[in-house]
A protein has these predicted regions:
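Nucleotide-activated sugar donor-binding and catalytic core shared by glycosyltransferases
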Residues: 1-357
Length: 357
């Protein structure tokens, strides 16, 4: 939003979102916290709320009649809204920024995305080639995680730390994954008594939640970027955190817990279109960091890989070289700025004032 406003100072905004969007001048019709239902069971329990959110969005679109609709992630909701907008506001431009990960699974969605949008603005450098295979267009605009790391480095000192060497543990952002992952991650790290252990706390999860697993000598921190940037190595729950860890230059092993690991293997082979799981590896197209998933997420396997990360300097340097290649592939251009320029440039001949939903 701020990037669009920088390009078009007369732009006005309305939508579904949170405090940050409201502070940037957006008229909020529904707070995103009333929409965050994770998993099939949660959606079933909240079907009436889900439908109410659709109704709110539909009525707001008809009331606002914006020039542009910008969709961000959340495909099950946004694709339905896009279909409604196409039917009722056919002149409106629709852009998908941070599109669904169709390159990983639910590949069939790519046809619906192409049919319902005027442009797809991807955040991974391999996405344009993937869309091209199906005869569609996707523009890579840059990566928001790269932008965040760059801004953090500009404001932070990375001249090293006077603290003793330590292992960073990033157990995830949700309580369920923290409770499943943290105990095994701690056990693996404890096998290296020459290194201290520090744990990253997730936003919205109280310190007291971690207390049942953390010894008194293992501190909890909410400054995750600083924790990772100065760590000697890290154990990271798979997700965006693996990419953040790579861009911060910390050797890592990635883990992922599943409740039914054998069933996960069948699901992976049947539905998942990528043979790699973590973002750094997917971006590179090969395994730069070891992925300890499902049956392979054991204390022994994690500790074995951690030993190499801590003690094998040549191995560490190869990983850091791969990290540099990831940064090169992601590029330096800010994703929001590029996306804003494309959006405004494509509609500024239609209206003097941009109304964005």
């Amino acid at each position: 939003m701020r990037a669009i406003a920088d390009v078009d100072s007369a732009a006005q905004f309305a939508g579904l979102g949170g405090d940050s969007m409201r502070q940037a001048g957006c008229r909020i019709y529904q707070d995103y916290r009333q929409m965050a239902f994770m998993g099939f069971e949660a959606v079933l329990r909240n079907l009436s709320n889900v439908q109410r959110n659709f109704t709110i969005a539909q009525k707001a679109l008809l009331l606002e009649k914006p020039d542009v609709l910008v969709l961000i992630d959340y495909p099950s909701f946004n694709l339905r809204i896009a279909a409604f907008a196409r039917r009722h506001l056919p002149e409106m431009k629709i852009y998908y920024y941070v599109p669904p990960k169709v390159w990983a699974w639910k590949q069939y969605r790519i046809h619906k995305i192409a049919a319902l949008t005027d442009a797809v603005l991807g955040i991974f450098p391999f996405e344009p080639d993937f869309y091209r295979q199906f005869g569609y267009t996707c523009t890579y605009v840059g990566n928001p995680t790269m932008d965040q790391i760059r801004r953090w480095k500009e404001l932070s000192s990375l001249h090293g730390s006077s603290d003793p060497p330590y292992i960073a543990i990033l157990p995830g952002s949700r309580r369920s994954e923290i409770s499943h992952c943290l105990p095994k991650m701690l056990e693996a790290a404890k096998r290296f008594p020459d290194f201290a252990i520090r744990v990253a706390a997730a936003p919205g999860v109280d310190d007291s939640f971690y207390a049942k697993w953390l010894p008194t000598d293992v501190p909890l921190t909410r400054d995750t970027y600083s924790l990772v940037a100065h760590a000697h190595a890290a154990i990271v729950n798979s997700g965006t955190a693996t990419l953040e860890t790579a861009l911060l230059g910390c050797p890592q092993v990635a883990v992922y817990h599943v409740g039914c690991p054998r069933l996960f293997g069948l699901f992976w082979r049947t539905f998942f279109k990528m043979r790699l799981f973590t973002l750094p590896n997917i971006i590179l197209g090969r395994e730069a960091i070891r992925e300890k998933l499902a049956l392979h997420f054991t204390v022994d396997e994690v500790a074995e890989e951690l030993s190499r990360l801590l003690h094998d300097e040549a191995y560490r340097q190869r990983m850091l070289t791969d990290y540099a290649e990831i940064a090169r592939l992601l590029g330096d251009t800010p994703a929001p700025v590029n996306a804003a320029k494309i959006i405004v440039q494509n509609i500024n001949n239609q209206h003097e004032v941009t109304n964005t939903w």
